[in-house]
């Protein structure tokens, strides 16, 4: 795996999955090689845009403005430890879910997918993650929004 412009994005593979980590706004070409086969993909990194109106975790609401500069929020694990909480991502107008919502424990090698607004068991200790991928309906820009329970 390689990136033609490593200052824009870093590319790497773990097991059979390929990753590109954005570093700054710009364009790069990601190249993946396997044996005699080479595949290339153009990647455009855009400036982060907040897609969140609010997030509800149990009875608590996280204001959308908390996501203005970063696509993640740290939530108190001890407050929800070993409980089930309904988690709902409320998106701003013009944004849609790519898939549903995924959650995983820090030591899992898998994740579980559920619908937005599902009741999720918060367990496994600090490092529990809830994540969703969303897309801007007009521009096609995608953002991964995450709750990290610490």
Labelled PLM ranges:
Residues 1-150:
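Extracytoplasmic soluble-region selector
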